[in-house]
Regions:
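N-terminal flexible/basic segments that precede or flank functional cores
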Residues: 1, 42, 52-54
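Structured, helix-rich domain cores that form ligand/interaction pockets
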Residues: 3-4, 12, 16, 58-332, ...
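Short basic helix-loop element that most often maps to the first helix and adjoining turn
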Residues: 8-27, 52, 327
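Conserved hydrophobic/aromatic packing and binding residues within compact polymer-binding modules
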Residues: 10, 24-25, 35-38, 334
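Short coil turns linking two alpha-helices in DNA-binding domains
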Residues: 20, 31-34, 330
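Recognition helix of helix-turn-helix/homeodomain-like DNA-binding domains
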Residues: 29-45
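DNA major-groove recognition helix of helix-turn-helix/homeodomain DNA-binding modules
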Residues: 46-62
Length: 404
């Protein structure tokens, strides 16, 4: 983009966001007169100042450049009655769950609804385990929305049912690219980070990580040990989506992500804080501020007194609007199966079709007619034919009346 196009787009954004020249100039560390000359095309732009202006204008975006999600939720219930948990806590109809005679973490079986997993065991010390990973959280939000429940309500239901927290991930998503992951890595390596964490790992987008670490996430920084009960992870979400789904990097809504990953007791205390204050920003950033602070070097002072880096200060709350716990409901669809079909199977199907035409055979037709649907395929068809509302169990147990 040349300077003329950039300046015109900048002017339009500034007016759309309701930002005065003076306010933007102050944020960029220049005078209003200097900025005015830039916007009129009378002052040439160098790459460094252009980058500063691009970053600062997005901080005024009224569409909230940062938002916070629950991205992993795992809780164990002290009961062997999985169906009761499905009906009373998830408030879903078991008829829409797929039963599978295998599970994870030592559980013998599980009930599945899309990416919502309920692990089952007849051993009382294992009980029933609800696991919601990223997609599972988004799908659960569809049901919570239809039930007119919030995450806070759902967590309270889990705790009321005797739930024991096993894992909770809070994800702060950066839509404007303000959280510069490569820069954070450089500052950490340069010793410009005040932290209680003893361990740190960083990966470039081409490195293969261990089994406990996600792959293909662009530049990645881990703060704390991944085997501990609390650690943090910052990575380039747009690169991850490009590798996983082929989404163009510039078209990805979320540019960067900062995650707080908590297990067991740490997860429990985070949930208690969320339920006490119902303020996800307070919970998330009190944890972040306790454990880590990125600073700018001041060699004439002790490290603990170094000034907080401007970008980091904005990220943790200085001079920005508060962020709330939001939801991004995404119903389960056949898209994953269709994507696999398109990439892995469609070329072979097309080849067999051509072979049938050439030889006047019906190989493909015969194969489809002879194929038998497995339970998981029937389950997918059941989900496609039903609505979110139809899967909800509206009969709230009598003992829960009045809680909400």
């Amino acid at each position: 983009m040349n300077d003329k196009n950039f300046i015109e787009e900048l002017r339009q954004k500034r007016e759309e966001y309701g930002v005065t020249q003076t306010r933007l100039a102050v944020a960029c560390g220049i005078s209003r007169e200097y900025y005015n000359r830039i916007e009129k095309g009378k002052q040439p732009l160098n790459d460094e100042l252009r980058e500063v202006i691009e970053k600062q204008i997005e901080r005024f975006n009224p569409q909230e450049p940062l938002f916070l999600l629950i991205d992993y939720f795992r809780v164990r219930f002290p009961t062997t009655d999985a169906l009761a948990i499905i009906r009373d806590v998830l408030q879903l109809k078991p008829d829409y769950m797929l039963y599978e005679d295998y599970g994870k973490y030592g559980y013998e079986s599980k009930y599945v609804l899309g990416d919502i997993n309920i692990m089952c065991s007849m051993q009382e010390h294992l009980g029933v385990l609800l696991e919601l990973k990223g997609k599972g959280c988004r799908q659960m939000e569809c049901y919570l929305l239809a039930q007119e429940r919030s995450w806070y309500d759902f967590m309270l239901d889990c705790m009321t049912a005797g739930g024991v927290m096993k894992r909770l991930d809070l994800a702060i998503n950066d839509k404007a690219g303000i959280l510069d992951i490569p820069k954070l890595k450089e500052k950490y390596k340069a010793g410009e980070c005040v932290s209680y964490f003893r361990m740190q790992k960083d990966y470039s987008g081409t490195e293969k990580c261990g089994s406990d670490l996600p792959k293909n996430t662009g530049e990645t920084l881990y703060l704390g040990s991944t085997s501990s009960e609390l650690y943090m992870c910052a990575y380039q979400k747009n690169y991850e989506q490009y590798v996983k789904n082929g989404t163009e990097i510039e078209d990805t809504e979320i540019k960067n992500r900062f995650e707080i990953r908590m297990k067991n007791e740490r997860a429990y205390y985070a949930v208690v804080d969320l339920l006490t204050y119902r303020d996800a920003e307070r919970t998330a950033f009190s944890i972040i501020n306790h454990y880590v602070r990125f600073v700018d070097r001041e060699d004439d002072k002790p490290k603990s007194q170094w000034i907080t880096n401007d970008d980091w200060a904005w990220f943790v709350g200085e001079n920005r609007e508060p962020i709330r716990l939001t939801t991004k409901p995404e119903p389960y669809t056949l898209q994953k199966a269709l994507h696999w079909l398109q990439r892995q199977v469609a070329p072979t199907i097309k080849m067999v079709q051509a072979l049938d035409r050439e030889n006047r055979t019906t190989i493909l037709k015969d194969m489809i007619e002879q194929a038998e649907l497995k339970d998981k395929h029937k389950h997918l068809l059941q989900l496609e034919k039903s609505t979110i509302e139809e899967r909800i169990d509206t009969a709230v147990p009598q003992e829960n009346d009045g809680i909400f």
